[in-house]
Amino acid sequence: MAQQQKKRRKRKVKKCKLCEMKVEYVDYKDLRLLNEFLTDKAKIIPKRVTGNCAKHQRMIKIAIKRARHMALLPFIKL
């Protein structure tokens, strides 16, 4: 019997949105940008989903945590 060959799909390489915008610093007061990296339950979206590089993902994480501490963003949404 001939074995069937599985067709492999090439994954689309996600590019860091912040690298393309040439962002050097993610500010905790920029809520419009930070909300793009939060789920509807206010959880931080992982970098494998967003396609961010490690450097910018760390900056986003720190900025979101600072904004939460300053009560600019909620910790959870119900």
Swiss-Prot record:
Part of the 30S ribosomal subunit. Forms a tight heterodimer with protein bS6. It comes from the Bacteria. One of its GO terms (molecular function) is small ribosomal subunit rRNA binding. This is Small ribosomal subunit protein bS18. Gene3D superfamilies: Ribosomal protein S18. SUPFAM superfamilies: Ribosomal protein S18. Belongs to the bacterial ribosomal protein bS18 family. One of its GO terms (biological process) is translation. It comes from Pseudothermotoga lettingae (strain ATCC BAA-301 / DSM 14385 / NBRC 107922 / TMO) (Thermotoga lettingae). PANTHER family: 30S RIBOSOMAL PROTEIN S18, SMALL RIBOSOMAL SUBUNIT PROTEIN BS18M. The keyword rRNA-binding applies. Binds as a heterodimer with protein bS6 to the central domain of the 16S rRNA, where it helps stabilize the platform of the 30S subunit. One of its GO terms (cellular component) is cytosolic small ribosomal subunit. InterPro entries: Ribosomal_bS18, Ribosomal_bS18_CS, Ribosomal_bS18_sf. Keywords: Ribonucleoprotein, Ribosomal protein, RNA-binding, rRNA-binding.
